Amino acid sequence: MKKLNNPAILVVDMLNDFVTGALACDRGKAIVPAMAQLLDAAREKGVPVIFCNDAHIAGVDRELALWGDHALAGTKGAEVIPELNVSSKDFIVPKRRYSGFFQTDLDILLRELGVQSVVMTGLHTHMCVRHTSADA
């Protein structure tokens, strides 16, 4: 297997509201143990772990009209699930749209960390993971 150059792990929307809450995804629960192992291994090797998460503004974000209230900034639903053990060395990038790159600090963070390869994981691959991948 080819070695990745300056990798980072990018975790998209592994939030309480998407795993067990307002927009729960039963299949999402199944990937949690393997994802937790991946993140622990990355941290042990010094690979940056970045969480890119929905953080909507109630009554403002248009997406809420489509999907209902979910991942409202500052609520428990917008927090990363506890099983992924967010570390003080991890990075959290809030987003208000499907793409983690649209009007966020994700691009500059990756550049400043010197990241050249990104391993993506997360929930709703047909939505936020897909849009973030396309914009990368």
Kindly give the residue locations of the regions a language model identified.
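Short Gly/Thr/Asp-enriched flexible loops that form oxyanion-binding sites at enzyme active sites
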Residues: 129-136
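Internal catalytic-core helix/loop-beta-alpha segment
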Residues: 81-123
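Active-site acidic carboxylates
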Residues: 1-91
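Basic side chains
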Residues: 43, 95-97, 130
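Phosphate/ribose-phosphate-bearing ligand recognition and processing surfaces
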Residues: 123-129
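Active-site environment of divalent metal-dependent phosphoester hydrolases
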Residues: 58-59, 100-101, 127
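Hydrophobic residues within alpha-helices
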Residues: 35-38, 106, 132
